C-alpha cells in the first residue's frame, strides 16, 4: 500500500474544473487522482507509516532534496466522502495559489465530463468575496485548454468539514477553503523575499509539505480539521502567546502540547510492537492490541448491568450506560442542546447551525444536511408511525420497534399489554388529506398542480356558499310522476370557472341517462321490491369516497371543470318550482320549527342545496368517482321520488332504504327550548339531509339537503356512512294534536334489551337531529300498515345507539321511522345480545367476531289490558326524563317517537313506554356529570292503558303488576337499564342505581322461593342484581351509585322495612360503590354471579396463548354490608369466594387487567387462552395441583424487569420443579439475579430434583453458599467482591449444575473466558478449567459448613496469550489450585500435576485505557474507527506486504517487563534479547530506509 500511494505521477486531479487546470497545487502529493471510482466511493483507510518526503514533485516522479532534516507525511482515509465523515480529512491547499513553479505543476485531465455545467450554484453558494477572488485568480492564471474547460460532475459534492459547506466544483470549493485557512506561516526570510522568481526556485521549508490549509499565525501549526485548530488555539490562550512550540525533527508536525509531541514521536520510534497471530495487525499499544484480539474471539467483557448489552470496549459501555441514566454531559456551544456523546452534538451543529441543508423532503418543506435523519423523515410520509407507546409519547413505524422500546424503556412496567390491532394511526395535520388526494388525483408527467387553481376554487366556493344561502328558497326540487325537471341556471361564479377552464369530457352519456331514468321508474312501480333496490345500490355501497376535508388545493384544472360541470348538471336535474310554503336557508340557517301545511292533498316537497363549503367537505375525483357520484344522485332521487303523503308510502320509503343494506348509525343534535344553549355535534363532515314531517291530517313532507358529490361520506369496511339532518315537530306519525305531545328537556334512557323484544318509542318535539346512516347488510323487513306499527324481523341483534353531544343513546330495533341509531362511543359488537340462552339466565354481552343468529318475528298489537305483557307475563316500565316532570300523551293507534337527550359521556339505553289515555308522570333527573335518574309513577287511581307486546316462541322473562292504591315506582340512575320483577298483588319498590357504563339487572323468581339479594356494580364489567320475593312479603332493593357516594343494599321485610339482613349461606356480601376508584366484590352464594374487575387495583395480567398465569390477589379494602337503613356500607374486611360458581372473564382484548381473590393464599396456575373466558366454578379442584410442570419457560425477573430464558435450546422448558409452593431463589447480593446465560445466547441447563433448591446468596464479602440435594451438601466459594457470578460460556457445552456426592460433574470454560469482569477487577484468563472428579479431598461431609473450599483446577491446554492471572489476597492462603501446563503435543497424553500453594501466574492489575493509541494497523480490524476516538493522532500503521513474510514465523508475545537484551537497534538504540524480536523491529525501520534510498535514486537520475 505504501508503494501504491507514494510513487504516483501527476495525472487527473481530484478537482477537475477548467479554472485550475494548470494551477500548481504545492501541497497535492497524495495522488488521489489515480484512484478508481470504486475506491473513491467506498471508505478506505490508506494509512502509511514513516513516509519520509522532502523536496519537490515533478511530472516524472518524486524528487527529494535532503537538507539535513527528514520530512514525513501521513496518508489518511481517502474517498469522496472524506470531507464529511472521515476523521482524517486531508485536502491540501495553500492560500498562495499564485505561486508558480515550473517543476511543481500538475496537468489535470478530466476524468468524467458532462455537458451540464454547475454555473447555477455560483450565485447561490458563493459569497461576493469569493466571486471577486475567482475573477482575480482567472486573470492571473494561464489560459486553459479546451479539454480542461469541460467541467466534471461529481457524484457527491465537495464538502468543507468546519462549516459543512458543499460545492460541486473545484473552483467553488478551493476558494471557500481560503476563508477558513489562516495566514500561511512563512519564515522571516521568506517574508522578505518577493513572491516571484525566488519563490519559484526555493519554496520555504516550513510550507513545503503541510497537513492542511488551516494554519496558526503564532506558531505555524497547520491542520485540515477546524476542531483541531480550535483545540490548538486553547493551548495558546492558556499559556500565552510566548508558549513554546514543539516540532518534530522528522516531519513537519508541530504542536504546543508536550504530551502530543511525545505521543507523535513514539510513532517514529516505537518500543514495543504487538502483532496479531491471525492477521497482519500490529500496534505498539497494548490496549489497542487487546481490543483487536477481541474482534477475532468475539469476547465482550463489558456488560451492562441493566440490559443484555455487551461491548468489547469500555468507552462503548460508558456511552451505552448514559442511555439508561439519561445523562447528557455534552452540550452544544451555540444553543442549549445536550447529548450523551460528542458525535450527536457534532451532528446537531452540522444540521442546525452550520452550512446549507441540501436534502429537502419531497412531501413537505423539511430540510436537513443529515442523510439518516432525512431517510427517517421521508419514511414518516411513506410509512407513518402508527404504533403508539401506551406509556409515553413514543411512536414507531414497525411493531418490532415498539416492542423493543417497551422492553428497553419501560421494563419496570409489568402491566403493559400492547394490542397493536387497536393502535390508532397518528398523523400530522394536513398529511392525511394530502396522502388521500395523492392516491386519487391523476398525476400526468409528474407535474404538480398550481396553487392558483386551488385559490380560484376556494373563491368560487365562497361565492357559491353565499349564493346558496340567499337562493336556498328558490332551489326546491319537485318530483311529479317520477320525473325530474332538468332545467336550471348556472351561477355567475360557475360560469366564470367554466369559461376559464378547459372543458372536460362528458362523464355520463345518453344511454347512461336513459338507464338512469328507467331505474327511477322501476323503483316507482315496485317500491317494495327488495331485490331490485338492493341491486341498484350495489355500486353506491362500494363507491370509492375520498376524504377531502383536509385536501388543500390538490385538484387539477381539468378535474375542477369536471366537478363543476357535474355540479351544474346536478343542480339542473334537481331544481323545480316551489310548490309549498316551507323553505330552509341551508344547513347552518335551519329554523327550529317548520311551518305546518293545512292542505289535505298528497304532496311532496324536497329541497336540494349544493355543498356550502367544499374546503371542509370531500371531493370525488376521477372518472370512477364521477360514475359512483352519478349513481349516488340516482339513489337519492329514487329515494325522494318514493315518498307519498300516505303513511303507508312513508313506510315504503323507509322500507326501501332499509332493504338497501341500511344499518342506521345516527348522531342526534338536540335543540331544547330552555335556557340551555343549543348544542350541535357533527360526526361526519358532509351530509345528505333528510327531513320528515307529518301534520295532523297525516301530510308528510320531506326536505332533502344533498351536499355536492355526497362529499362527506365516509367509507368503512363494508359500510357507507351518510349523515341526515332532520328538523321535525314530531319524528313519527301522530294523529293527536302536536301540542299535546310535549316532551321538553327529556333525556331518554337506554333501551332495555332482552332477547329481541320489540320496543316502542317515545314522541319527540322540537328535535334537530343529524342522522348518520350506515349501510350494512339487510337486517329489517317491514310489513306496512297505515294504522299499526310494522312487523319487525330482527336479524343480527345489533343494538342501536342515539348519540348526543354528551351521551350515546342505545336503541333497540323498534319502529322503522324512529331512526335506529348507533352511537360512535362504542363498537356495535360490544353490545350484542346472545339470544341462544334461556330467558332465566342473564344475557351476557359477548362478541365472537360473527353475527349472532337470532331471527325473531316481533308483533306489536294495540293495547288491550292494563299490563305490559311479554309472552303472557308483565314487562317493566322505565323512562329517563329531564329535570321536571312532563306529561306525555301518546297516540292510541300510532307508534311513539324517541326524544334524543344528553346525559353522561357513554351511550344510554332507552326503555319504551306506551301509556294509556291518561298522561303519565315522568320525572327526569339530570345530576351533572352523573348517570341520569328516571322515575316513572303509575298511579292506581287513574286508569292506565299499557300497550301489549307479544313475542312469538319466547319464554317469559319479566312480569310487573300494579296492585293496591300505592304507586309502583322504578327509579334508575345510570346509563344502563334495570329490570325489576315482583309478585302480583303486592307492593314492590325497587330502586336500582347501576354503575356507569354497565347494565344493572334486578330480577325475581317465582313465588315461594327463598329470597336472595345480590348486587354487583363495577366499572367496565357487566353486573347482575337478582331479587327473589318469597310468599306475600314485599321486597325492596335499593342500590345507590352516584359519584363517590356510598352504596347500600337493603332487602326489606313487611313488618320492619329497616331491619335488613344480608341473605346467603354463611357468606357475607360486599358491594363496590360504583363511580369511585376502589373495587369491591359482592360475594353471595348464588347460582350465577359476575366477578367485578377494577382497573386500578387489579393485578396486571399479561396473557399469551398456552401461558400459565399466576393469579393471586389479596384484597385490602374489603367491606361488610351495613344493616341500617340509609347508612353507608362498611367495606372493611376481606371475604373469599371459593364456595361460589364464578365465571370470570379473563379476556385481554379490552386490555383490562384481571383481579382475583382466593382464600387459600397459594398461587393458582391458570392456563389462559387468548380472548377466551375461564370458568372458576365450584367444581374446580381448589386443592394442591397434581402437576406444576410449566408449559412455557419460567418468567424469572432479571435486571429490572427483564425475563431470564431458561429454556433448553429454545425448544424445551427448563426443569425447575421444586417443592410445591416454594420458589427457586436465584437472587444475589444487592438484589441482583444470577447470570446463568451460556454462550452465544444459549440458555443454561439447570437440572434439579423435585425437592431440590438453589441458593446463590452473596452479601458483602461473605461466603456464597451453593445448596443442592436433599442431604444439603454445601460448597463454600470465597468471593472477594460483591459482583455477580458470570458463568457465561461461549462455544462450549452447557454447564451442568447437577450434584453427585457433593461435587459438580464438570465446570468448563472455553478459551478466552474468565470469571468476573475485565475492568478494574481480578481476571482469570486461561484456556480451560475442569474440576477433577478424582479429587476426593474436596468432598464436604453432610450437615457441615466450611468457610473455605479447595478446588483442583486443571489447565487442559495452554493459552497462546496467557499474560496474567489475578487472584485476590484472600484466596492465596485458602485456595489450593493445581495447575498443569503442557504443549500441544502433550495435551492428549496426560499431564503431570504440580501442587502449589498459590497460582504460578504473575499478579497484576489491568492497565487502564490510555488516551494515546500509538501505532496500529487497520487491516483486518473492526475497531480501527473506535480506538482513535480520544486521540488527535491516528498513529502509524503496518505494511501488509512486509508482514506477509512474518506470517509463517512463530508469534512471540512481548512481555511488558523489560529484560536484558543483546541486540541493539541502529535507529533507536533499543536492545532485544531475541533475534526474532530484533528482526521484526528492524524491519519496521527499514520502511523509512526504503523510501530514503528510493528518493536518493530519483535525485541521482
Curated annotation (Swiss-Prot):
SMART domains: ZnF_C2H2 (SM00355). Residues 186-200, 498-512, 594-605 have a biased composition (Basic and acidic residues). The C2H2-type zinc finger 5 is required for nuclear localization. It is found in: Nucleus; Cytoplasm. It holds the Pfam family zf-C2H2_REST. The keyword Transcription applies. Transcriptional repressor which binds neuron-restrictive silencer element (NRSE) and represses neuronal gene transcription in non-neuronal cells. Plays a role in the early development of the nervous system and is required for proper patterning of the neuroectoderm during gastrulation. This involves the correct speciation of the neuroepithelial domain and adequate development of the non-neural ectoderm. It comes from the Eukaryota. A zinc finger (C2H2-type) spans 158-180, 214-236, 246-268, 274-296, 302-324, 330-353, 359-381, 387-410, 1463-1485. One of its GO terms (molecular function) is zinc ion binding. It comes from Xenopus laevis (African clawed frog). Keywords: Cytoplasm, Developmental protein, Metal-binding, Nucleus, Repeat, Repressor, Transcription, Transcription regulation, Zinc, Zinc-finger. GO terms for cellular component: cytoplasm; nucleus. The gene is rest-a. Residues 1067-1079 have a biased composition (Polar residues). GO terms for biological process: negative regulation of DNA-templated transcription; positive regulation of neuron differentiation; positive regulation of transcription by RNA polymerase II; regulation of alternative mRNA splicing, via spliceosome; regulation of osteoblast differentiation; response to hypoxia. This is RE1-silencing transcription factor A. Residues 186-209, 491-514, 569-612, 885-929, 1040-1079 are annotated as: Disordered. InterPro entries: Zinc_finger/UBP_domain (IPR050688), Znf_C2H2_sf (IPR036236), Znf_C2H2_type (IPR013087).
